[in-house]
Amino acid sequence: QDLIADPGFHGGGMHCTKSGGKLDIHLDYSIHPKLGLERRLNLILFLNKDWKDEYGGNLELWDKDMTKCVATAYPKFNRAVLFETGDYSYHGHPEPIKCPENVARKSLAVYYLAKARETSEKRYKARFVKRPQDPDDPELDKLRKLRAGLNTAKQFYKSNN
């Protein structure tokens, strides 16, 4: 396939999460809102020198039915994780990070794009989901449902056409 790295780093680039921060499990956007290309691969490079196990921040990869975590990646310095971005690539670091205030979980994210496939679901925003062990939270469920609208972000971007 003809993959290209996202030239504008839409949603990518440098990510920095401080103590107490987290990233709930989600599916990434599938269609780039400016280029109209489909996101196919995520490359995450961890930049955490002297990261300790007790800080947490592991990247979790979940199965397509969101019933179990199938892999984790410790955010060790210079570790790279490459995974397909598709209709079932649920991932995140959902547990609050427990690092000192002067430390942060750092990573560089690069997304690779290609011509959109007809069979792919069209998501213009990340779709956040609840893990089986997450407590019921009606307010958070309402927010997840609101964000899940497939066209909720498209209205914020100008078309190149």
Where are these regions (language model features)?
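Signature of the catalytic double-stranded beta-helix
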Residues: 1-12
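Catalytic core of Fe(II)/2-oxoglutarate
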Residues: 20, 30-39, 49-161
